[in-house]
Design a protein with these regions (language model features):
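C-terminal motif of bacterial Sec signal peptides marking the signal peptidase cleavage site
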Residues: 12-15
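N-terminal active-site segment of His-dependent metallophosphoesterases
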Residues: 17-106
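Binuclear metal-dependent phosphoesterase catalytic core
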Residues: 20-41, 240-282
Length: 282
């Protein structure tokens, strides 16, 4: 394993492009703290988004890990088109790793910014930060730490989006998460949290930079289970997984990468109860 990592480091160091190699292997909390600060500044100026839907039962779509390389993201575009055509659906989420290399973020951001499509909400992934990608990502999406509401005729649901692209939430974001749950969760019917990196990992398929420390995992679990969070969605591993801890569902998505054999997205049906389905591509 050590030999393999050393080979990867040497290959990356030989590249002409400025790849942030250190960040791939060592979680840097100062990076996420800086991004959180910038995200919260944007949030304060922009205000909280509230989506109003005409019924108490509604649907939303969620995907992760597009990994755009040299071709436009056909499966992501298809999912957005399906969501728009679905009369029960009103928005979608994209949980990070838009990029594989350093180019063509606009192929996704243009789809998400198209006013003819339903609203889309994104968070940053670890691949999106390589090649100093945060500035490009921020210019397109503005914030990766935020929450929004969905208002129905009788209820309000809260959706919390988190930045874990360095394999840590960092102290600033943890404090922000605790505050949001303490001050905004009451009065909401359901609470959904979305994050790129898996909080409950069931395999070791990804780099160690994206593992939460055990201490941080315990703290996050304590925060989430103590605030009556319903579901936590993540991507990153490219292989679906469903775990339950403390009454909270932790769901890892497949990737939606065009050449992935197991590519899928999810639909989530929200009402008095919550249902979900993985939708594969044929």
């Amino acid at each position: 394993m050590v030999k393999r990592l050393l080979i990867l480091l040497c290959l990356a160091a030989a590249s002409c492009d400025k790849l942030e190699v250190t960040h791939m292997f060592i979680p840097l909390s100062q990076d996420v703290n800086k991004r959180v600060e910038e995200s919260l500044v944007w949030n304060a100026a922009a205000g909280v988004t509230t989506l109003t839907v005409p019924r108490d039962n509604y649907r939303w779509y969620v995907c992760s890990d597009i990994h755009v390389d040299q071709n436009r993201p056909a499966r992501f575009a298809e999912m957005v088109s399906r969501e728009k055509a679905d009369e029960d659906a009103f928005f979608y989420q994209m949980l990070g790793d838009i990029l594989f290399g350093k180019e063509h973020l606009d192929w996704v951001s243009d789809i998400m910014a198209d006013p003819s499509n339903d609203p889309g909400f994104a968070i940053v992934g670890n691949h999106d930060l390589f090649y100093e990608g945060w500035e490009t990502w921020k210019a397109a999406f503005h914030s990766s730490t935020y929450y929004y509401y969905v208002e129905t005729p009788q209820f309000r649901d809260i959706y919390i989006m988190l930045d874990s692209a360095n394999g840590t939430l960092g102290e600033k974001q943890l404090a922000w998460l605790e505050d949001v749950l303490e001050t905004k969760r009451d009065g909401c019917r359901h609470c959904f949290v979305s994050v790129h990196t898996n909080i409950l990992r069931t395999d070791t398929s990804q780099f160690p930079s994206t593992n939460f420390t055990l201490e941080e995992t315990y703290r996050i679990l304590d925060i989430l289970t103590g605030a009556n969070v319903d579901m936590v969605f993540s991507g990153h591993d490219h292989v679906r997984d469903i775990s339950v801890f403390g009454g909270v569902y932790f769901i890892t998505l497949d990737s939606i990468k065009d050449d992935a054999s197991n590519a899928s997205y999810m639909t989530v049906d929200v009402g008095q109860t919550i249902g979900y389905s993985f939708i594969p591509f044929e």
